[in-house]
A protein has these predicted regions:
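Conserved anion-binding
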Residues: 2, 68-72, 77-153, 158-161, ...
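Glycine-rich phosphate-binding active-site loops on the catalytic face of alpha/beta enzymes
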Residues: 79-92, 189-222
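C-terminal helical cap(s) of enzyme catalytic domains, especially alpha/beta-barrels
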Residues: 95-101, 105, 200, 213-232
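Conserved, mostly hydrophobic/aromatic
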Residues: 7, 31, 61, 84, ...
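Structural motif
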Residues: 26, 52, 79, 150, ...
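Conserved beta-strand positions in the central sheet of alpha/beta enzyme cores
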Residues: 6, 32, 57, 85, ...
Length: 232
């Protein structure tokens, strides 16, 4: 896979999702299905979107004991998604169990990505709420190395950290970066953000963009703007 814009379809129903996707005549944007939509509609929404020809990032952020995550991934592997994820904080045994569960009998599997720190987390929250008394970029780098050593394909991180992650873990270690906003847009609840062009310059492999596209007056134009700034 090359650089791509992943559209976060954070909708409450299949009806809303398809009404949004139907606007993209002749285009098949890479789609992220998150907790809200998946829990509302179940695995059938994945099958329906996949049948339309979209690549899918299933963003459920699994985090549990290793055996539970392994069994959950063994179920998710049958949905034919392109990318799925878990929390790096679950540690090495959980990540290795996830890989084992996700791998099909023929050896194929979706890409498996670990979430380091959510882009809504800032230094104050890291120290006061999570009780990690380290700089946030140091924590991300540690999680990135742990993830790579466990055999995963990359991490979800702020675009602020993507370049450093590639320096530490290599150019083939993928960085998927939310927290992307247009220069003239609202940052919302994100604390660590960049524009699509800045994310491209710093080396992000994929950007995940939600409200700047889904809530735009013209979602297709907003998507095309993202693609032009990040991919072209």
């Amino acid at each position: 896979m090359g650089k791509d814009v992943i559209v976060a379809c954070d909708f409450a129903s299949a009806e809303q999702t398809f009404a949004f996707l139907d606007q993209f005549t002749g285009r098949k944007p890479f789609v992220k299905i998150g907790m809200e939509l998946y829990y509302a509609e179940g695995p059938e929404i994945v099958r329906q979107i996949k049948a339309r020809g979209h690549k899918i990032f299933l963003d459920l952020k699994l985090h549990d004991i290793p055996n539970t995550v392994k069994k959950a991934m063994a179920v998710l592997r049958n949905l034919d998604v392109d990318i799925t994820n878990l929390h790096a904080a679950g540690a090495t045994a959980m990540m290795k169990g996830a890989l084992e569960g996700l791998t099909r009998e023929d050896g194929t599997r979706p890409l498996l990505i670990a979430v380091t720190q959510l882009t809504s987390t800032d230094q104050e929250a890291l120290e006061k709420d999570i009780l990690i008394d380290k700089p946030i970029d140091e924590v991300v780098m540690h999680y990135a190395e742990t993830t790579k050593n466990a055999g995963l394909d990359g991490i979800v991180c702020s675009p602020l950290e993507a370049g450093k992650v590639h320096d530490r873990c290599g150019q083939n270690f993928l960085t998927i970066t939310p927290g992307v906003r247009f220069a003239d847009g609202d940052v919302g609840d994100q604390k660590r953000v960049m524009t699509p062009a800045q994310a491209k310059a710093i080396g992000s492999d994929y950007i995940v963009v939600g409200r700047p596209i889904t809530a735009a007056a013209d979602p297709v134009a907003a998507y095309e703007r993202c693609v032009a700034e990040f991919c072209d």
